[in-house]
């Protein structure tokens, strides 16, 4: 009995120890399960949920989840704070979703595309949409460094976006500033279409004085371009402007109609002709394959910078000038009833015409316009009595003349320069206009020069290149309520392509560089007694004509250095666009590469 008394407390003590151990182990396993539940809530819920069991209401699940969070908060307050922050973030995301959906529905399609590109750019790792649970796992698993990294990526994206926007703005401003900085260059896009149909078009360049007041003296001069397909005719018309036309592509037959006679001329590439104001004329393209391109310098008579064409026929593009007269005037003029005049000259406007007549008119309506197609028989009749231009000898007072009929005034292996001055041609004498035609070979340079009096309007006929024009820009500054002008030397440059126009003001030095064979047509305004002064070259160089003492006083270098520098260029008027030193370096580089290759081959073989 006494022995059992001794063993009983020992047994109780052992049982107590076992109980405490069991409790400790249970607590440890419970904490581990809680951590697992916290890390993988989706998997835990999936394991606990019986597939045969009916799904519980969403409200009940939220209550149970809230209860578990409170228990975890009691065990670990910091973890509870994180959970509350996550809940707040989740609630904010849930509130943002409807707004985003509404914005996506309201914004246009291209805006959505840009937004998707932006999202892909600053979130490159996010390849597919994620569920809310996956996002929570990603947020819970990420450390503070990953949050900093995502913020850094976002900042990087915004910086890249700002740089891209600034670059686009800079490019736009550059293009705008180019147009503003160089008012002397007009691309082919600056033409305005007056008439167009499937047979051709007539375009007019914008006014020269719209860009700068320095070209006010050109407000009464316009450039017109006429293009037509093979076997077409521009209908008869007269204009309140004098024309000087030049054929730049194809062949043409132009007919000049006067009250007492009619004269037809065959024109080819480079032929020019003056058409006086008020003269009725029409132009035929007799070629079967080649398009016709004619450029005209128009000099308005009635209104500076504006001129109008008057057609005797009515088309979809232009009304007949006969339609402007009253019925009584027309009947008295032709001594015929108005209905007959309308049928013959103006066209039938009867609204009661039948279906067949309407269909026939609709079919012919497609061919109506100021440029129409002609048959082979009609072409032969129109060209039967036509004369050709004079290639050699003295130009006629009314017939066409070719710009390259005489020898070029400047010529070498790099180019040719032809000119017809008012003194040499009676057709342009009273207009005080000269015509030039320049051929610059690929890789050649028309040396810097300037014109003493003439303002030249230059049309790029063929090829590509660039030019540099040196002018003076006035800068006005107001100091002490007095306006002062500062003169600054300015370079105006532009790329040249076919159809472009550029202006060379009098006194402005210019040089032209040809990246391919370049052909230029020039109209010189105020050309009488104009003198062309070259600034470099072995001949006609005004700098070389300066006295030695003046050279000494004018330039930083000595007169001897200036003369030696001028003599370095042995060509005149046209020269190689690449400096001789650069060519020598390129030759030495090619020679070195060849020697290196030969040494490598000799080593191998």
From Swiss-Prot:
Gene Ontology molecular function terms on file: nutrient reservoir activity
SUPFAM superfamilies referenced in this protein's UniProt entry, alphabetically: RmlC-like cupins
Q: Where is the Cupin type-1 domain?
A: 184-342, 401-563
Bias (Low complexity) occurs at: 140-149
Glycosylation positions in this chain = 406, 513
Question: Which Gene3D superfamilies would you find in this protein's record?
Answer: Jelly Rolls
**Which range is the signal sequence, renumbered to this chain?**
1-30
Question: SMART domains this protein is in?
Answer: Cupin_1
Domain of life, per UniProt, equals: Eukaryota
Keywords, sorted A to Z:
Allergen, Glycoprotein, Seed storage protein, Signal, Storage protein
Q: Biased composition, Basic and acidic residues: where in the chain? A: 37-105, 150-179
Spans annotated as Disordered: 37-193, 346-367, 382-405, 574-593
Assembly behavior: Component of globulins complexes which accumulate in seeds.
Stated role: Seed storage protein. Accumulates during seed development and is hydrolyzed after germination to provide a carbon and nitrogen source for the developing seedling.
What the record says about family reads: Belongs to the 7S seed storage protein family.
Other observations noted: The variability of the residues taking part of IgE-binding epitopes might be responsible of the difference in cross-reactivity among legumes.
List the protein's name: Conglutin beta 7
Q: Which gene encodes it?
A: BETA7
